[in-house]
Every structure is written in C-alpha cells, then in structure tokens.
C-alpha cells in the first residue's frame, strides 16, 4: 500500500475554507470512545485542510484527546483540539513506536508551505512567502503495513510548536488484512516473511502483470504534470487530474463546498497545465523547460571531434559497458562524444547548494558509465537535497548515464511527487522510487544512495556465503546487510523490509539482484561502490563456486583495523607535514577531486570547484 502523505490527484491549488457541516455531521460516529468521521475513502490535503477549518467553528466535532486505537475501517478521521501538543497526538495503543534502538514503524514527516489569501483560503506557497506550514507525520506499523496513520497539524511559521487549527489523526486500513494487536512487535522477522508476503500479495519470485500495472498506475496518477512555462517560478504549479479520476472521486465522495471566489488570484499564481492522457502502459509525460543552451565556463579545452575509428570503438563500448569488465581494477574509459555535465547557470533560479549537488550527482552518473558499471537506462543513484531533506534528485528514466546532466535530473519528494521534472520528457523509475525513498526516509543521515547491478556483485549475491573478508577492499567496505529477492522492486510495501535489512550499515547486497550503497556524501558513496566492486571481483576469481576450503582468512583484529583506518578521510593514509593528516579530507573526497580533474581535462565541464 502507498504510504504517501496524501493523494493529491484532485488538487487544483484552490483550497476551500469550509466543508459542509451537514456532510461531516452525517458521518460522525463514535470509535474508540472518541468522535470520529467515517469516510468511504482517504482524502487529499485539500479536503483535510477544509475539515480542519470547519472544525474550528464546530466544537462538537472536536476531541479533547487523541484516540487509543483505530476502528480498522477504510478511513477514520479524528479531529483533536488544537491545544493538544504534537507529542501527545502520536500516542495510542500501538505506541511507543520506538523502543530503545529498535525501530517499530516506518515513519516520515512532510512539510508543505501555505499562505492565506484575501478570501481566507489556504493556497500553496514557497518558503520565502509562506505564512503557514502543514506538518504531516506518516506512520506505518511494521507488523501490519495495511494500517496507515497520518497526523495533520497546521502551524504558523513564527510559532511552529503551536497549532493554529484543530489537528487531524487519520487512520486508513485496507480491508482483508489481519487486524494487528496493540503493541505487537513491528520488526519483520525473516521467519515471518512468507506470512508477510501472503498478506501483501507479494509473489515469491515475480509480480503478476495485473498487480504490477496497478502499482504503476497508482504511482503515476500521483505525479504532477510540469508546466513548460515554469522556468522562472518553479515552485508555482498546479495539479489537474484526468476526467476519469475526477468522475471517480465525485462518485465516491462529494464534499459540498462553496464556490471559490479567489479564482482570479489563483490563476495569477498558478499557471494552467496541459494534461496528457495516461496510456495503458502507465507511461507519463512531464512537460519541462527546454534544455538550457548555457553551460558553466570551463578552464579546460573541449576535445576535438573524434575520427571514424573512435566512433566505432565507442559503439562497441556502449553495448558492452556494465555487462562484462575485463579489467582487474575498474578504470574509466572516456567517450569521444561528450555532453557537458554542468549545463545550468547560476541565475537559473536554483539554490547554490542544490546546483552544486546537481553537478556532483550528474558527474557520478558519468563516472559510473565510464567505469563501465552502467546498464543502459537502468539502475539509479540519488542524493538528498540539502535545502529540503524530504526531497531527492534522481535520473530521468530513459536517459543513458552518458547523457545525464545537471539540468536533466528530476527532483521528487519522498511521496513520489515530482517537484522539478528537469529538462527531459521522461518520468521516474518506479523501482528506483520505492528503493530510494525507503532508505532516505529510514536513514536520515544518508545523503547519497547508489543502486547498481554489477555482474561481479550479483555473482557474490547468489553465493550462500555472501561477501567474504578475503581482500583489503572487502574489509574497507565493512559489515554488509542482505535483502532476499522478492521480484522487481515496484511494491511500496517492501520498503519496511528494505529498511530492516539495511539496518545501520552502509552497504546492502540484494540477493540475486545487485547492491545498495549508502554514503554520507556523493564522494563517500562512490568510494564505497568502488571498493565493493573490486572486493566482489576478487572473490569470484578466488572462490568462483563458493568453496572456501583453500582460502586464507585474516584475523578479526586485522579486519577491524582496516575498516577503522579506511573510514577516515584520505583513506586514513594521507601523510603530510611529517605525519598522517587525513582528517583534512572527507571520506572519498581525495579521489573524487582526482576524477573531477580528469573529467574536466577531457572536456566534460563538471562545474567542480577544486579544494
């Protein structure tokens, strides 16, 4: 099931001030000894904000304390007095959600900026001109992913600890699933994986076509269509759903709302969007701005046009890249045809930190391609946006890694909503969204996540012994987690399993699939990826069949010493001024700068600022 903060498929940017009181009072019932609004289906942010505003004037809808348990129906909305603080709101019989260091739920928080217009309606805003923040805390019980709880709080920016409207506690429960017991252990143990798969309808090896299409359609229906004219005001866009979606919503639930009078103001703030019909293949087209013809100046000269011999070599390399590596130690093989990486200008409207991240992430995609680790348009790498921890940058699904540039990267939040569609007409890989959103949400300290299918790592992932500490590179990588293969990663319910299996490690091997690397920076992620691949290539040459009878294993003290030393900047061995002075370099930064110098020398225009 989706654990996004809401389903904004019917959001046109106009927020009505009041929901019909008659509509709400007809759905008022008693659940868990509390007043509850029983709705046939979960709503979107528009509707929830309207309920909060209406409840402000009708105290008979408001509870003085949160419920202890849900009633396990499709959608239950508990309105709670605005005087109840945020710490009290999340307490129920399934709390505490964290006991000691054990994570008992998958949790995430989302923040949306608004301002109040002259008609008293909330309209979306950017951080610079917003006056209010809608805080949404999403919690999914690990032992029962069918149970979803969201807490909605509207606060003013200047007093974020004080609610300005009644809060909402929304429980949604998918019928047909077993009702969880209060305080049931939420850790998904391996011995219960078969039961979890049965509950979630996850086949053992692959997904049925109907199930896969349903998941894809649900994901793509949540994606906003990007306006072609949003180059100067990227944060100002609206979402219009297809007519079929609107008809369906009107049949299921009809909020009786007064006509919005501030339409003219809304039209000035939010541009109209051209809606494209969704095809049965679940593909989506995102209207984007054209690729900027401007690039950042480079101090290096662009390489000359390649001759015919080089072109033939590149064609061969393109088809073999990432499939078979003949090098003992991976080394970049540079292409004669070069697309500049840093193709955005400083005045394109991006935050300087995000612009640097875009250049770095695009450079990492190029390095992965040049190392011959890529597989066409597949696999994915993400980085958390420094200005908003709930947003990540990812490649456009349809581009080769040799085509990725700063402008083509897509910015998406952890709910799957596209914030900036980049310079292409491509969308986001659903498997990439499921994997990366889970890790970025479960591990807030992780900044960069790399997922690749390198053949050597896949070979080790298929060995029962897993990664062995038989090379220095494997010791540098450190402790590794393992995730069992359950088919292509398109089911969002598998995110809790991914977070559990990763734990606090930086590397996770996906059985019969590939690997995931988590870095505290882009540079760190590349360094870990590099050493993991070398370690796996060494292992499949040493123990191709997994027989370790004739293998020498180093002492545990040596293994720990290698990891401790290598975990420092400069690999822990950078000697300067008569002593080891590695701390001036962050993890992976020393070799990253070397790669950037080489890329710029070849004319890739990385936009890198040398240290």
UniProtKB/Swiss-Prot annotation:
SMART domains: Aldolase_II. Membrane-cytoskeleton-associated protein that promotes the assembly of the spectrin-actin network. It is found in: Cytoplasm, Cytoskeleton; Cell membrane. The keyword Cytoplasm applies. NCBIfam families: PRK07044.1. The keyword Cytoplasm applies. This is Adducin-related protein 2. GO terms for cellular component: cytoplasm; cytoskeleton; plasma membrane; postsynaptic density. Gene3D superfamilies: Class II aldolase/adducin N-terminal domain. Belongs to the aldolase class II family. Adducin subfamily. One of its GO terms (molecular function) is actin filament binding. Keywords: Actin-binding, Cell membrane, Cytoplasm, Cytoskeleton, Membrane. It is a peripheral membrane protein. Pfam families: Aldolase_II.
